[in-house]
């Protein structure tokens, strides 16, 4: 049984020191597509965290009974089933957001973070640790999404969660929104800037040369 210190490290590590996007450069494609608004970034964070945590838990519970030759198929079946459930819940209770997220909820099944944690961690680790690892990696993914979404929506549209924060010139205010921030390439540059800032602050994350 894992102690509290180990559980805390597994939960906090992916958010701070081993972020799946900032350090491992995983899950970048969806991060580019769903961060034009805080609302979509938050819902995608919740969806991926739920899938990652629950898939880790279920895979860990049956890890000793999965033949090595079919382990990837079993993992993908579990992940796909959870993605279908999450997608149906969103369709039922957050239809407008589900439409905005489009295919990206369904594509969680191919997300490198979810598949990577299932194979590299859940297959070798007890259920509780695997569950916490899934939550930690989901929150680490979400931290980057929400940071990028905050900048893009605030300065690209003058709002947060659809609520006007900066009064726009078109409405008689003072702020001229930067439409470039709402385009997908801006997310790429913002994520790159975040990675650079993190590695300046944490030099140990810079890859060794040679």
Curated annotation (Swiss-Prot):
Its EC number is 7.2.1.1. One of its GO terms (cellular component) is plasma membrane. Keywords: Cell inner membrane, Cell membrane, Ion transport, Membrane, NAD, Sodium, Sodium transport, Translocase, Transmembrane, Transmembrane helix, Transport, Ubiquinone. GO terms for biological process: sodium ion transport. Coiled coil: none annotated. Its main location: membrane. It is a multi-pass membrane protein. Signal peptide: none annotated. NQR complex catalyzes the reduction of ubiquinone-1 to ubiquinol by two successive reactions, coupled with the transport of Na(+) ions from the cytoplasm to the periplasm. NqrA to NqrE are probably involved in the second step, the conversion of ubisemiquinone to ubiquinol. HAMAP family: NqrD. Composed of six subunits; NqrA, NqrB, NqrC, NqrD, NqrE and NqrF. This is Na(+)-translocating NADH-quinone reductase subunit D. The lineage of its organism: Bacteria, Pseudomonadati, Pseudomonadota, Gammaproteobacteria, Alteromonadales. The gene is nqrD.
